Amino acid sequence: PGGSETILSKHLPSYAVVERNDILFLLDGDKNKKIKPVRISEIADADLVNTMCKYYGCELIINASGSNGKKNEQESNRLKRQVLEYAFNKVKYLPFDTPEQLLIEKAITPSEKEIIDSQTWSSNDPELYKNQIRLLAQHLYDKEEVNAEEIFCLQQMMTARLKNELPEFIKIRKIITQALDRGIIR
C-alpha cells in the first residue's frame, strides 16, 4: 500500500534486509527513469544516497545500529548497498505510465468516451487519467463528489472489461516470467 515513494523508501528496505525473495515491485511506468543500473561496487559510500535518489526519486531508508546518538557508518553503508542492489533486481515498471491511463485508453465504453469528450482536458495535467475516472464515477453514481471506494469500484468494473491478450498484459507476464526464470523471485 502507498505510492511508489512510500513503497520504495519504507517497504523495500525492510524486505531487502531480511532478503525476501518472493517479491517483485511493479511500479507505474511513469516512475521509470530509464537509467541503466551501475555496479554497486562502483558507487562510493558518499554517493549511495544520491544514487538512490537518482534512480528512484527518494532515499531508500535503512536503520543501522548505533550508540550515543551515532549510527554505525560501516553497517549503514553495507545496508545501503544491500538495499540498492535489491532494488536494482526487484524494481520493475509497468509498460504504460499509470493503471488509470490503461483503463481510459483500453476499457471505456462508447458512452463513457462521450462523457470524457464532453469536457476539456489538459494533456499536461499529471492527474489527467485519474480526473477522467473520477468524472466517470461521478456520472455512474450521479453524485457531485465520489469517494475512493466508489472510484475503486468503477476501476474494478473497467478492469473486468480488459482482454487477457492485451499487449500490455503480455508485457507484464513477460516481466514476471523473466523474474521467475532469472531467480529474481521464487
Q: Over which residues does each language-model region extend?
A:
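RecA-like P-loop NTPase motor core
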Residues: 1-34
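Terminal low-complexity/disordered tails
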Residues: 116, 126-186
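Hydrophobic, Leu/Ile/Phe/Ala-enriched alpha-helical segments that form helix-helix packing faces
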Residues: 11-16, 79-83, 176, 180-183
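Extended interaction regions within the primary functional domain
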Residues: 10, 85, 166
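Generic hydrophobic secondary-structure signal
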Residues: 26-27, 54, 63-73, 103, ...
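Activity-critical C-terminal alpha-helical subdomain
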Residues: 28-143
